[in-house]
């Protein structure tokens, strides 16, 4: 009976792992100086997501590459964050993020735009499940800083529901204001 339970637990863990997509962002050879010389190892940066709005990143170090990747993947799964997506495909509004000397600007994009982002940011958006976004990185191009800056920006994003709750309004009132301020609607009003 204990074996049955143990087997079921393992199956659940494998099922949970299969829902995640992981991307290796960066691998680096590192050296530890010891009495007899240098001891080489590897450091891996991995981004993990379920392509439904949850994403995390992790850093792992080990003597062998596969072990470093495994450690980084486990760390990424422990640090997942949830990001609210508009229509399940893009951001609700433009956001900025920063970590160290790495700065990123993320902009919501119309349907069909695709992921316009470079390197480490693209991996974050693909594992997150975002389909339309325009991103620009400024400053440092260090993958660690860019991934952390991207996560900082994603954490700064507010959904209309959270903004409405903070202001004591209904979501429909916020979205009505958004439609009133839309430049496409004002041009039609000027023609009429």
Swiss-Prot record:
This is Small ribosomal subunit protein uS5. GO terms for cellular component: small ribosomal subunit. The gene is rpsE. Part of the 30S ribosomal subunit. Contacts proteins S4 and S8. Belongs to the universal ribosomal protein uS5 family. Keywords: Ribonucleoprotein, Ribosomal protein, RNA-binding, rRNA-binding. It comes from Methylorubrum extorquens (strain PA1) (Methylobacterium extorquens). InterPro entries: Ribosomal_Su5_D2-typ_SF (IPR020568), Ribosomal_uS5 (IPR000851), Ribosomal_uS5_bac-type (IPR005712), Ribosomal_uS5_C (IPR005324), Ribosomal_uS5_N (IPR013810), Ribosomal_uS5_N_CS (IPR018192), Ribsml_uS5_D2-typ_fold_subgr (IPR014721). Residues 20-83 form the S5 DRBM domain. The keyword Zinc does not apply. One of its GO terms (molecular function) is structural constituent of ribosome. With S4 and S12 plays an important role in translational accuracy. It comes from the Bacteria. PROSITE patterns: RIBOSOMAL_S5, S5_DSRBD. Disulfide bonds: none annotated. GO terms for biological process: translation. The N-terminal domain interacts with the head of the 30S subunit; the C-terminal domain interacts with the body and contacts protein S4. The interaction surface between S4 and S5 is involved in control of translational fidelity. Residues 162-192 are annotated as: Disordered. Gene3D superfamilies: 3.30.160.20, 3.30.230.10.
